[in-house]
Amino acid sequence: MRILQLSQQFPFPEIDGGKIGIANIYKELAKKGSEVTLLYYNDTIIDQKIKKEAENYGNLIEIKHSIKNTKFRILKSIFDNKPIYLRKHFSNSLFKNVLSQIKNKKFDIIHADHSAMAELAINLKKILNIPIGLRLHNIEWKIWYRYAEELQSGFKYKYIIRQARLLKKFEEELIKQFDVLFPITNIDLEYLKNLDPKLNLVMASAGVDVEKVKPIKIEKNPFELIIATTYRWIHNINGLIWFIEKVLPILKKEIPQIKLTLIGKDIPDSLRKFQSKNVDAIGFVDSIIPYLSRASIYISPLFVGAGIRIKILEAMAMELPVVSTSIGAEGIPATENDGLLIANNEYEFKEQILKLIKNQNLRIQYGKNARNFIINNFTWDISVSKIYESYKKLLK
């Protein structure tokens, strides 16, 4: 099976949830015997060693293109009847460039990751006349709506709510044109069923490489909280600022030695300014395994988002109990006994974290339960097998 996979970014190294999802689909499809060509947008310099490693699984086609929300793009979008999220991912000139890059190449299936790549996939189908599939890592318009709800008023609110409404309209129309759709949560699955009962839907959730992501023997810090995330997304930053300003002070009153470790590339100054004995903004690390092995609790104070937080799944695979908002934990059908504890305000975060810190046996048991939950429900082999088998059916 010759698969053209469309991605809005080069997904290596696998340093954030978005990249992890795309990279593992690419690798797992190749492992199942497919000839995969990964076509991606990029405007940065890629480490050639990392690129060579990616080429061990398939072919790479780079399209020089930036998807940054520049001031010029944002200004133009104020008067545009197409949402900026889709406008920046597709244009006629971009399409012509893609066609020139795949000229004389043969494909059986087009696989698109994220609705950002939906328009490109649909237009390629018109030329290549082959089936198209879309993996919905999230329902994008929901994220914009939740952001608007958080803002509530002002010019920024008016801009975001308009973009959300436009995106909902466009995204729903694009979704209906695919031969198969792969939602990653039950919430998204039900939404799509209600959108159009005739849609071909196959649940294919996120996953974890449980052989690679597992704890190592290292001394635990019973007072250490940790989060690993991408700081390119403003909602992750806002959630952490809220946690540091609202939750950490009340935790420090009871446990002065409490410590929050921040892992991830490009930590902004708005978070680095909190560096202290209680906040350690480490930044990018080659391997997150030692840090997750040392910490005792993973946190996810996210108030805007959709889809699944892959970093939460990885933390659970590392035998870490997780304290998260309902939105942060969305799409993960785990209970408290499975190691996923819900907290939606500062007092709930405080209570859940203190409960785990003060009861070592409970914390350890929740951690073991969390890993078992991931092994039984969230592996890449399970998820990508569903995608692979769905494509085989389309080609019969």
Give the residues covered by each predicted segment.
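N-terminal subdomain of nucleotide-sugar transferases
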Residues: M1-I61, I250
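Acceptor-binding helix/loop patch of EC 2.4 sugar-transfer enzymes
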Residues: Q8, K71-R87, I132-K169
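Acidic donor-binding loop of glycosyltransferase active sites
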Residues: D179, N278, S293-G307, M318-P321
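Carbohydrate-associated surface elements
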Residues: I187, L195, A206-G207
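Conserved catalytic-core segment of nucleotide-activated headgroup transferases in glycan assembly
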Residues: M203-R294
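Short hydrophobic beta-strand element within catalytic cores of glycosyltransferases
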Residues: K311-E314, P321-T325
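Conserved acidic donor-binding segment of nucleotide-sugar-dependent glycosyltransferases
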Residues: L340-Y347, K355-N361
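A short, well-ordered alpha-helix in the C-terminal region of glycosyltransferases
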Residues: K355, L362-N377, S383-E389, K393
